[in-house]
């Protein structure tokens, strides 16, 4: 066995760098935190090659004494703690004294700093862990650190880095977290010479809007609870703002971004009664407590912490959020009994009453009931302000009566005649439907038509297709269909999802891509750094899925083309979900193995949505598609698309024959 020997300092620093500096974002975090601890009021960051080629951070802080500038690059050298008692009460962002030494061991680092009482700045360089002699330099008061060619001397670690776009996204996200925690400091970011953002010193309210977004700010509730010893403040999103991603969840403890299970569990418990399924809340929480009440020396990255009294922290977070959410429970609108009151509170609209059996004239509203002369808006369940909104269980309102001139009446009748003109296809569809519904009932057709035999194209009762024919739509969600000896209930969204999914798979297999169509007017939307990075890395892959997107700059993307098959879908939501899938999948080599998952996400957007009213031909067309689609018994998520109630089961429900 070889003899035991002490490792050289350079190798020790490189080993430590494996924990402290996993990627450029970690190096950026260590450097910016030093600027914050130095009392800087402005921090400027420049990145090249996603932070791999260059990270430059300049600040206007107190600077480093000329005699200490070499020591700043030595391992375990710091000005922030001196005793064990200091470690137990640490209030600074950094304290371990190994960040700069670790970065210097895996990059070409240049440190330039000047204090206010110095006539000139002092500069020192480090390459492969070797320090140069300090030299005089020109520099304003403050410090600038340049870390170039990260991991140039550790190729094994460098090859594990992602693309420049992905690494940049991590750096930008890291800087945004630091900016969010310190709104009193001005931050700026340049990428490859181009300004990305420039945030002045501002209030927390303004900083949240700038980082998290105006949409979050509009849909958020401000919270502030606790006392001088333990305080929780910030903003939490209303349940209606909940998303399927966790990219808008920020926890700060003493202005340090952390991932803490205690706080996250308390938040989840507070939202438990108002959020369901895979939706996650958005929030920006700041917890302030004495430094001795929290241990930040758990991991070199300092994102994991331990509370001395985790129960107290959990109760504060839970009760504060639970109280704030008490009046915004999403399930209030789910109850028919109080839906009218909720609609009135939200929109100022009073729902229309159900017509009574003894008040038949109420089925038609006269123009006097609507002074504006407009029809009630039935585009959604709530309607528009000042108009009557039909309840989900209420039939569509009949057209209003208006007095028309003879010429207007004739024009209107001509229009309606053309609108309701039947085609041969619809006649055949309705004939099949009537045959399936009523069988061979006595005909009420005039006598001179009773001798005409049925067309050979109309199936008899015994020739009904497997899923029968549609007879009605239920609650805007389900299709009722009559088969030979049963009643079928079909989840129209789940069924259409499976049909679209299989069609897209077949089109990809046959053509190699999905057929797309250009939008007349491109649709733009604000994107996250991760979404922009996914577009930059996978633009060709997106084109294969029928999506054409372009980067407009300023974290704004434009959708220029969408799949023909999904022409009626929300293209922004579709683009976001596909970009999210690509970002999660990662490299192009693994996208092929996850192609079906991406297609499943896309098919969901192109499927019939709940609440959409279908005609009988549309419903029957879906049934026929189901019959010709493989695996149409389940949707893409494993849920059944239809259930069957036989005549015997229906008889049992009504106690017939017992």
Swiss-Prot record:
One of its GO terms (cellular component) is mismatch repair complex. The gene is mutL. SUPFAM superfamilies: ATPase domain of HSP90 chaperone/DNA topoisomerase II/histidine kinase (SSF55874), DNA mismatch repair protein MutL (SSF118116), Ribosomal protein S5 domain 2-like (SSF54211). SMART domains: DNA_mis_repair, MutL_C. Keywords: DNA damage, DNA repair. InterPro entries: DNA_mismatch_repair_CS, DNA_mismatch_repair_MutL, DNA_mismatch_S5_2-like, HATPase_C_sf, MutL/Mlh/PMS, MutL/Mlh/Pms-like, MutL_C, MutL_C_dimsub. Belongs to the DNA mismatch repair MutL/HexB family. This is DNA mismatch repair protein MutL. One of its GO terms (biological process) is mismatch repair. It comes from the Bacteria. Residues 114-138, 353-405 are annotated as: Disordered. Gene3D superfamilies: 3.30.230.10, Histidine kinase-like ATPase, C-terminal domain, MutL, C-terminal domain, dimerisation subdomain, MutL, C-terminal domain, regulatory subdomain.
């Amino acid at each position: 066995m070889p003899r035991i020997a002490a490792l050289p300092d350079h190798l020790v620093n490189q080993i430590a760098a494996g924990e402290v500096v996993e990627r450029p974002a970690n190096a950026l975090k260590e450097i910016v935190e030093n600027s914050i601890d130095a009392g800087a009021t402005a921090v400027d960051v420049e990145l090249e090659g996603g932070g791999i080629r260059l990270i430059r951070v300049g600040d206007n802080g107190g600077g480093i004494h000329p005699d200490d500038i070499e020591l700043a690059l030595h391992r375990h050298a710091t000005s922030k703690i001196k005793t064990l008692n200091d470690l137990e009460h640490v209030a600074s962002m950094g304290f371990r004294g190994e960040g700069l030494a670790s970065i210097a061991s895996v990059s070409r680092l240049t440190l330039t700093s000047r204090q206010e009482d110095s006539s000139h700045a002092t500069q020192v360089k480090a390459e492969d862990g070797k320090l140069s002699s300090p030299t005089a330099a020109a520099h304003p008061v403050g410090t600038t650190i340049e870390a170039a060619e990260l991991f140039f001397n550790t190729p094994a670690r460098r090859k594990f880095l992602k693309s420049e776009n992905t690494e940049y996204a991590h750096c930008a996200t890291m800087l945004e977290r630091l900016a969010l925690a310190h709104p009193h400091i001005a931050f700026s970011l340049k990428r490859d010479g181009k300004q990305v953002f420039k945030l002045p010193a501002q209030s927390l309210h303004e900083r949240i809007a700038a980082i998290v977004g105006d949409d979050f700010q509009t849909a958020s509730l401000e919270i502030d609870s606790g006392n001088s010893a333990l305080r929780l403040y910030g903003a939490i999103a209303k349940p209606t703002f909940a998303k399927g991603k966790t990219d808008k969840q920020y926890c700060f403890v003493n202005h340090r971004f952390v991932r803490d299970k205690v706080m996250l569990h308390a938040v989840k418990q507070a939202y438990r009664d108002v959020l369901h399924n895979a939706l996650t809340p958005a929030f920006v929480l700041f917890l302030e407590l004495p430094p001795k009440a929290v241990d930040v020396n758990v991991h070199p990255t300092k994102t994991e912490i331990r509370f001395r009294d985790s129960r107290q922290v959990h109760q504060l977070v839970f009760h504060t959020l639970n109280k704030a959410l008490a009046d915004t429970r999403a399930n209030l609108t789910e109850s028919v009994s109080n839906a009218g009151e909720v609609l009135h509170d939200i929109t100022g609209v009073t729902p229309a009453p159900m017509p009574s059996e003894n008040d038949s004239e109420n089925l038609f509203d006269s123009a006097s009931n609507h002074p504006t002369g407009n029809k009630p808006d039935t585009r959604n369940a709530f309607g528009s302000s000042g108009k009557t909104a039909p309840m989900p269980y209420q039939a569509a309102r009949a057209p209003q009566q208006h007095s028309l001139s003879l010429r207007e009446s004739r024009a209107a009748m001509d229009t309606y005649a053309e609108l309701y003109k039947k085609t041969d296809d619809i006649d055949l569809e309705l004939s099949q439907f009537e045959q399936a519904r009523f069988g061979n009932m006595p005909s009420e057709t005039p006598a001179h038509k009773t001798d005409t035999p049925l067309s050979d194209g109309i199936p008899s009762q015994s020739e009904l297709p497997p899923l029968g024919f549609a007879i009605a739509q239920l609650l805007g969600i389900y299709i009722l269909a009559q088969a030979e000896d049963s009643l079928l209930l079909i989840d129209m969204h789940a069924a259409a999802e499976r049909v679209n999914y299989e069609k897209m798979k077949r089109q990809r297999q046959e053509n190699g891509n999905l057929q797309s169509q250009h939008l007349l007017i491109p649709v733009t939307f604000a994107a996250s750094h991760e979404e922009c990075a996914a577009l930059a890395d996978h633009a060709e892959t997106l084109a294969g899925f029928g999506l054409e997107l372009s980067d407009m700059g300023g974290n704004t993307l434009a959708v220029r083309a969408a799949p023909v098959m999904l022409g009626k879908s929300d293209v922004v939501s579709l683009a976001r979900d596909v970009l999210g899938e690509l970002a999660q999948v990662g490299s192009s080599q693994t996208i092929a193995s996850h192609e079906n998952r991406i297609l499943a996400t896309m098919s969901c957007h192109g499927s019939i949505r709940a609440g959409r009213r279908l005609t009988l031909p549309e419903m029957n067309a879906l049934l026929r598609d189901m019959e010709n689609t493989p695996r149409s018994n389940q949707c893409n998520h494993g849920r059944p698309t239809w259930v069957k109630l036989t005549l015997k089961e229906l008889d049992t429900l009504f106690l017939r024959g017992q």
